[in-house]
Amino acid sequence: MDLPIQDSHDSSTSPKGKQPTTAEKSATKKEDKVPVKKQKTRTVFSSTQLCVLNDRFQRQKYLSLQQMQELSNILNLSYKQVKTWFQNQRMKSKRWQKNNWLKNSNGVTQGCLVNPTGNLPMWSNQTWNNSTWSNQTQNIQSWSNHSWNTQTWCTQSWNNQAWNSPFYNCGEESLQSCMQFQPNSPASDLEAALEAAGEGLNVIQQTARYFSTPQTMDLFLNYSTNMXXEDV
């Protein structure tokens, strides 16, 4: 009976199983170990414990080590539980005070900006009164300037009229007539004419100076006003 022939594998050609390295071994070990998060145990307080803790917190927010131990013994709690509760309660109280302060500050700011009565502020009326008063002052000043300018213009015009009056021209005409004498005229006649012309010129100049004074102007204006009133 023939036996099956078994193939003999040569050591040089037969594949060898690869052995894992140390890095691969450590990686597999890490994968096998799944990290487990420790869940914090939350303390559940009874209503009686909460009443005692809140009452003590209202009276005293910071407790000493001895006071916390006494309170934990009374409430059948651990020292750490009492300490954690007081810390959390203090943080809540500070947050609540901060929120209320922000709300109150916003309310005060809006109250200042909004005017519920609907009346205009006092400074607007003062501004209107000041502007009205300034307009009246400007009108008074403009009227006074107008009156002063009118008087000055009248004085100047009167001076010009007095200076350019026919009396002054008459003096010039007399001088011109004297200068137009013929050279054959006697010397005595020429001297007499010059003296007469000089006296007339002095009289005219004095008259013009008199009428150019402010007192004469006032009298003239009053006289003209009275004459106009009588005509009416």
Curated annotation (Swiss-Prot):
Pfam families: Homeodomain
Record GO cellular component, one term: nucleus
Residue span of region Sufficient for strong transactivation activity: 168-232
UniProt-listed InterPro entries: Distal-less_Homeobox_TF, HD, Homeobox_CS, Homeodomain-like_sf
Location in the cell: Nucleus
Keyword match Cytoplasm: no
UniProt-recorded Gene Ontology molecular function terms: DNA-binding transcription factor activity, RNA polymerase II-specific; RNA polymerase II cis-regulatory region sequence-specific DNA binding
Keyword Thylakoid annotated: no
Record region (Disordered): 1-39
Sequence repeats mapped onto the chain: 123-127, 128-132, 133-137, 143-147, 148-152, 153-157, 158-162, 163-167
Keywords associated with the record: DNA-binding, Homeobox, Nucleus, Repeat, Transcription, Transcription regulation
Job description of the protein: Probable transcriptional regulator.
Protein name: Putative homeobox protein NANOG2
Species assigned in the record: Pan paniscus (Pygmy chimpanzee)
